[in-house]
Curated annotation (Swiss-Prot):
GO BP annotation list: DNA damage response; intracellular iron ion homeostasis
Organism for this UniProt entry: Acinetobacter baumannii (strain ATCC 17978 / DSM 105126 / CIP 53.77 / LMG 1025 / NCDC KC755 / 5377)
Record key words, sorted: Dioxygenase, Iron, Metal-binding, Oxidoreductase, Vitamin C
Listed cofactors: Fe(2+); L-ascorbate
InterPro entries tied to this protein: Oxoglu/Fe-dep_dioxygenase_dom (IPR005123), PKHD_C (IPR041097), PKHD_hydroxylase (IPR023550), Pro_4_hyd_alph (IPR006620), Pro_4_hyd_alph_FE2OG_OXY (IPR044862)
UniProt cross-references to NCBIfam families, sorted A to Z: PRK05467.1-3, PRK05467.1-4
Enzyme Commission (EC) number: 1.14.11.-
Organism domain of life: Bacteria
Residues given in the record as Fe cation binding sites: 96, 98, 159
Top-level EC class: oxidoreductase
Co-factor remark: Binds 1 Fe(2+) ion per subunit.
Ranges of residues in domain Fe2OG dioxygenase: 78-178
Disulfide-bonded cysteines: none
Protein name (record): PKHD-type hydroxylase A1S_0473
Phylogenetic classification of the source organism: Bacteria, Pseudomonadati, Pseudomonadota, Gammaproteobacteria, Moraxellales
Length: 227
């Protein structure tokens, strides 16, 4: 399931990110690509060792851990520290699948990539082309969101960033190991969580059905989660 998570960063944070990123030193994006995907990757990234990467990454991590919609959709267990990229004119990243296992930067710890995330840092009208195209069982989905918004989708999906024809596309990208690895189970839990939240709004926390459904939700988490 593809999720749109709005306003992960506010406009002031985005403006500060952009100021710092536009003055930064960029390296070729192939450094974080697998052998196969490197052949179709043409973009630029902030170095993983750059202090700016660490600074911006910490802000993104704090924002997503505090975002209730992200928590409900991803059920995150571990998060790869975010990286940052830019696509200038004629740059793109052809169809590829993300590596199934990745190292957490600066450690020997590995995580399973269940969910891929893109945090948009350019407004849609600042560049042409550059859509994130995600392929799933229902076809192709073209994604271009406002700056500060996140798209969250299963890492099993083939996806690409189409060629930039004008302007520059700035973004952050990262991966999540979920408490629940199966996408269909996460979808079910998210739908159940949505129903509980709507019932709480309309009937209050003391409504008996809220308590019953909350009990079911947490028992399913116990049944399906991996720690």
């Amino acid at each position: 399931m593809i999720h749109h998570i709005p306003n992960v960063l506010n406009k002031e944070q985005v403006a500060e990110f952009r100021k710092l990123m536009e003055e930064a030193n960029w390296v070729g994006g192939k450094v974080t690509a697998g052998t196969l995907s490197a052949s179709v990757k043409r973009n630029q990234q902030l170095s993983e060792q750059d202090p700016l990467t660490h600074h911006l990454s910490d802000i993104v991590i704090k924002a997503i851990w505090q975002n209730p919609l992200f928590q409900a959709a991803a059920l995150p267990h571990k998060i790869i520290p975010p990286l940052f990229n830019r696509y200038d004119e004629h740059e793109s990243f052809g169809f590829h699948v993300d590596n199934s296992i990745r190292l957490i930067r600066g450690t020997a710890e590995q995580i399973r990539t269940d969910l891929s995330c893109t945090l948009f840092l350019s407004e849609p009208d600042e560049y042409e082309g550059g859509d994130l195209v995600i392929e799933d069982t229902y076809g192709y989905h073209e994604v271009k969101l406002p700056a500060g918004d996140v798209v969250l989708y299963p890492s099993t999906s083939l996806h690409e960033v189409s060629s930039i024809t004008a302007g520059t596309r700035f973004a952050s990208f990262f991966w999540v190991q979920s408490l629940v690895r199966d996408d269909s189970k996460r979808h079910l839990l998210f739908s159940l969580d949505e129903s509980i939240r709507e019932l709480r709004k309309s009937h209050g926390d003391s409504y008996s059905e809220v308590m019953k459904l909350t009990n079911i939700y947490h028992n399913l988490i116990r049944m399906w989660s991996e720690l």
